[in-house]
Curated annotation (Swiss-Prot):
The keyword Nucleotide-binding applies. Coiled coil: none annotated. The keyword Cell cycle does not apply. This is ATP synthase subunit alpha. Produces ATP from ADP in the presence of a proton gradient across the membrane. The alpha chain is a regulatory subunit. It comes from Actinobacillus pleuropneumoniae serotype 7 (strain AP76).
Length: 513
C-alpha cells in the first residue's frame, strides 16, 4: 500500500498534534572530589543551604557550604563508591522525616527508616528536621510536673513540662540510667518519649531498647539511633530528627519528653564535618556556630499555648496546651564543667543535674550533687506534696556537707552539730535509689515526710534502706486507696498530713524492719 503526499502530510500533522512535550528544568552538577563523607560539587548554581542533593544509587547529600565556584555537601550514608565526574542534581527540598503515632514502639535511624525488623512504619506524614522554634507569644509558662521517679531529682531539682534540664557529668556516672528511668516513669503518665542515641555502641543501644521493653515503656517511646558506626552527618542530624518527631505531639496539644544522649558526641560530629569542609576552627577546634548548633535545637523544647495548638490544628484541638520537655546529656572530662560545650549548653538550658563520679563511686546513686544542681523553672511545676515536704532536704544536705568538711578537723563536736551530721547522713542514705525502680509521688511523699518530721532520728544509718522498703510495703498494703489517690492528685493539706503521720506512727509501733 502506497501513501500519497497528502495522506503523509495529514499523518505527520496528526502525530504532531498528539505529541505532548513537558520541559523539565533541572539544576545538575558534577562531583569534583570525594573525601571522608564530604563531596565537592561543581555546578548547582541554584542550590539552597541545607537542600538535599540527589546522588547516584538513590542516596542524598546535604548542601552545607555554598562557595563561589563549588558546593560542599555531606553524604548521608555510604560514600565509598562515589567518584569524581559523577552527575548529581538538586531536589528543591530540605530533609524531612516521617512523624506520627506509628513511630511509637519503634527503633528508627536518623532518616526515620525502621531498623528493628518489625516492618514498615505507618506514619501520619513528614516534617522538616529544621524548624524555627515557637516565638515568645506562642509559649506558656511551665507549671505542670514531669515526674522522673527519683526522690533526689523530684524533690531538689524538679522538672516541668516544656523545660530543658541538662544532665551533666563524667563518663560512668549514671547519666543514661537517670534518663532511661525518667522515660520508664512516664509509661502511665500520658507523656510520649523520644530517646535519641548519638555516637553510642550498637550493643549499648540494644540493651537500652531491651530494658525499655522489659519495663513496658517501649510502646510509649520512639528510639532514634545514630550509632558510632554511622557517618558524622547522621550523628549531627539525629537530634533534629528526634525533635521533629517530638514536635508532632507538642503541636497537637500533647506532652512529649525527649532525651539527647549525648550532645557532646553531636558537637564532635559537627566539628568533624566543619573541619572537613574547611570552615575556620575556633576554641577547642569547634566551629564558630557550635553554640547555634545546640541553641536552635533546645529552643524547640517549649510549652506552647492553647491558641498555638488550635491555630496549628486548624481548630481540631481546642483548649489544650502542648509541651516538649528536653533532657540533653553532656559528658564532661574530669568534672570540668567550664569547657566550651558544657558552658554553652548550661547557658541555654533551664537548669542542670550535675552527677559526680566521687559520689557515684562512694555508692550514692543517683550521684546528684545538690550543691550545683539547679532547676530554674521547675519549682513552679512541682507537685504540692513534694514541694511542701522537700523544703528541708536541700538545707539538711547543704548543712551536712559543710559540717562534714569541718568535722574532719574538729576533735569534739557539740550535740547540735552531731545531730545535724546524723540527720544529713540519713537523708543522703534515704535519697539513694536503685535503677529501674521509679517511685510514684505517694511513695516519695511518705518517705520525705518521715525524713522531714524526724521519724528517722532513732533509726540506725545501716537500717535506713530496710526501713524505707518496709514502710512503703506497709503503706501500699494497708492504705492502698490513700496511696493511689495521693499518687494521682499529688496534693498536700492538713488531712493528708495527718494521714501520713498516722501511717508512719502505726508502722513504727508495729513494723519490723
Amino acid at each position: 500500500m502506497q501513501l500519497n503526499s497528502t495522506e503523509i502530510s495529514e499523518l505527520i500533522k496528526k502525530r504532531i498534534a498528539q505529541f505532548d512535550v513537558v520541559s523539565e528544568a533541572q539544576s545538575t552538577g558534577t562531583i569534583v572530589s570525594v573525601s571522608d563523607g564530604i563531596i565537592r560539587i561543581h555546578g548547582l548554581a541554584d542550590v539552597m543551604q541545607g537542600e538535599m542533593i540527589e546522588l547516584p544509587g538513590n542516596r542524598y547529600a546535604i548542601a552545607l557550604n555554598l562557595e563561589r565556584d563549588s558546593v560542599g555537601a555531606v553524604v548521608m550514608g555510604p560514600y565509598a563508591d562515589l567518584a569524581e565526574g559523577m552527575s548529581v542534581k538538586c531536589t528543591g527540598r530540605i530533609l524531612e522525616v516521617p512523624v506520627g503515632r506509628g513511630l511509637l514502639g519503634r527503633v528508627v535511624n536518623t532518616l526515620g527508616q525502621p531498623i528493628d525488623g518489625k516492618g514498615e512504619i505507618d506514619n501520619d506524614g513528614f516534617s522538616p528536621v529544621e524548624v524555627i522554634a515557637p516565638g515568645v507569644i506562642d509559649r506558656q509558662s511551665v507549671d505542670q510536673p514531669v515526674q522522673t521517679g527519683y526522690k533526689a531529682v523530684d524533690s531538689m531539682v524538679p522538672i516541668g513540662r516544656g523545660q530543658r534540664e541538662l544532665i551533666i557529668g563524667d563518663r560512668q556516672t549514671g547519666k543514661t540510667a537517670l534518663a532511661i528511668d525518667a522515660i520508664i516513669a512516664q509509661k502511665d503518665s500520658g507523656i510520649k518519649c523520644i530517646y535519641v542515641a548519638i555516637g553510642q555502641k550498637a550493643s549499648t543501644i540494644a540493651n537500652v531498647v531491651r530494658k525499655l521493653e522489659e519495663h513496658g515503656a517501649l510502646a510509649n517511646t520512639i528510639v532514634v539511633v545514630a550509632s558510632a558506626s554511622e557517618s558524622a552527618a547522621l550523628q549531627y542530624l539525629a537530634p533534629y530528627s528526634g525533635c521533629a518527631m517530638g514536635e508532632y505531639f507538642r503541636d497537637r496539644g500533647e506532652d512529649a519528653l525527649i532525651v539527647y544522649d549525648d550532645l557532646s558526641k553531636q558537637a564532635v560530629a559537627y566539628r568533624q564535618i566543619s573541619l572537613l569542609l574547611r570552615r575556620p576552627p575556633g576554641r577547642e577546634a569547634f566551629p564558630g556556630d557550635v553554640f547555634y548548633l545546640h541553641s536552635r535545637l533546645l529552643e524547640r523544647a517549649a510549652r506552647v499555648s492553647a491558641d498555638y495548638v488550635e491555630s496549628f490544628t486548624n481548630g481540631a484541638v481546642k483548649g489544650q496546651t502542648g509541651s516538649l520537655t528536653a533532657l540533653p546529656i553532656i559528658e564532661t572530662q574530669a568534672g570540668d564543667v567550664s569547657a566550651f560545650v558544657p558552658t554553652n549548653v548550661i547557658s541555654i538550658t533551664d537548669g542542670q543535674i550535675f552527677l559526680e563520679s566521687s559520689l557515684f563511686n562512694s555508692g550514692i546513686r543517683p550521684a546528684v550533687n545538690p550543691g550545683i544542681s539547679v532547676s530554674r523553672v521547675g519549682s513552679a511545676a512541682q507537685t504540692k506534696a513534694i514541694k511542701k515536704l522537700s523544703g528541708g532536704i536541700r538545707t539538711a544536705l547543704a548543712q551536712y556537707r559543710e559540717l562534714a568538711a569541718f568535722a574532719q578537723f574538729a576533735s569534739d563536736l557539740d550535740d547540735a552539730t552531731r545531730k545535724q551530721l546524723s540527720h544529713g547522713q540519713k537523708v543522703t542514705e534515704l535519697l539513694k535509689q536503685k535503677q529501674f525502680a521509679p517511685m510514684p509521688v505517694s511513695e516519695q511523699a511518705l518517705v520525705l515526710f518521715a525524713a522531714e518530721f524526724g521519724y528517722l532520728d532513732d533509726v540506725e544509718l545501716e537500717r535506713i534502706g530496710s526501713f524505707e522498703s518496709a514502710l512503703l510495703a506497709y503503706a501500699n498494703s494497708n492504705h492502698t486507696d490513700f496511696m493511689k489517690n495521693l499518687a494521682k492528685s499529688g496534693d498536700y493539706n492538713d488531712s493528708i498530713k495527718d494521714q501520713l503521720k498516722a501511717i508512719v506512727e502505726d508502722f513504727k509501733k508495729n513494723g519490723a524492719w
